[in-house]
């Protein structure tokens, strides 16, 4: 998959490599352009800065069910707010909009935090070097299930004791705010308690003030965006569609 130079005449004779002919691409998402805009204009923008935008984006993926080379993306972003209010507002805005678009189709918000993902892995004895590999495998849970995750973790050279402890923890934690509280107590020696406290605050506040009916569950297997996101993660799914809406915090 290649894209050509934008508006430039190609010099096929002097090109040493095919990559010499390909330095421009179609817009992959709306987040990076927004980041550039914010970086260049932060001094003149309100803080926090809230943005809503819609536009076409492109992928190099092979077209298949649920994957398109071009589609319309809707982004809502909050920049410059380090508090949980940003997550709460984004979840409420998303669910309110979805409730008006598809009022008869129930949907579920799955939520997690990257700090919890790393805390669970450390608690179970995985090395720091193995963290990324472990979470990449965990992210496949929807597709390959517990047995597939166990098999891949062992094939990657992780200790069976750590794998068994990890899967048992994933199976037993409850998928609600009480489960997050219990997990925070379990992981208190390997993780900042504020991580679980913050997630509980988000979940309880959203349930208290939401005007739309939807499911809200803690999902300890929700990973996504390995190198991109650093904090809270949430994803919206609907029966027949799978995950079709997501948002994550980036503290960079």
Task: Provide a role label for each language-model segment.
Residues 2-25, 29:
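Active-site nucleophile/metal-coordination loop of metallo-enzymes that catalyze phosphate/sulfate
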Residues 110-112, 140-144, 160, 194:
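Short acidic alpha-helix initiation/capping motifs at coil-to-helix transition points
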Residues 1-10, 125-155, 238-241:
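Acidic, His- and aromatic-enriched active-site or binding-groove loops in soluble protein domains
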Residues 68-74, 111-119:
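Short, conserved phosphate-binding/catalytic loop or strand-edge motifs used
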Residues 101-104, 114-117, 130:
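Extended alpha-helical scaffolds
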Residues 16-21, 29-43, 49-104, 152-252:
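Positively charged, Gly/Ser-enriched RNA/tRNA-binding surfaces
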Residues 107:
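Glycine-rich phosphate/pyrophosphate-binding loops
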Residues 118-128, 227-234:
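Short glycine/threonine-rich loop-to-helix capping motif typified by GTGT followed
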């Amino acid at each position: 998959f290649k894209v050509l130079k934008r508006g430039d005449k190609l010099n096929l004779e002097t090109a040493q490599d095919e990559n010499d002919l390909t330095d421009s691409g179609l817009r992959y998402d709306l987040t990076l352009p927004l980041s550039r805009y914010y970086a260049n204009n932060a001094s003149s923008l309100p803080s926090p800065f809230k943005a809503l935008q819609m536009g076409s984006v492109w992928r190099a993926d092979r077209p298949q069910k649920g994957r398109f080379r071009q589609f319309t993306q809707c982004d809502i972003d909050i920049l410059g707010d380090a508090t949980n209010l940003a997550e709460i507002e984004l979840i409420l805005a998303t669910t309110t909009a979805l409730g008006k678009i598809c009022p008869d189709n129930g949907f579920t918000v799955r939520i997690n935090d990257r700090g919890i993902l790393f805390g669970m892995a450390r608690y179970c004895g995985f090395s720091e070097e193995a963290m990324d590999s472990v979470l990449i495998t965990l992210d496949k849970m929807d597709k390959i299930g517990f047995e597939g995750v166990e098999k891949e973790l062992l094939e990657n050279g992780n200790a069976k004791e750590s794998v068994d402890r990890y899967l048992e923890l994933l199976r037993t934690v409850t998928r609600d705010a009480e489960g997050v509280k219990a997990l925070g107590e379990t992981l208190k020696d390997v993780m900042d308690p504020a991580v679980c406290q913050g997630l509980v605050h988000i979940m309880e506040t959203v349930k208290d003030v939401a005007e739309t009916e939807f499911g809200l569950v803690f999902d300890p297997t929700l990973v996504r965006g390995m190198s991109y996101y650093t904090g809270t993660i949430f994803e919206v799914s609907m029966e027949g569609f799978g995950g079709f809406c997501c948002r994550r915090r980036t503290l960079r």
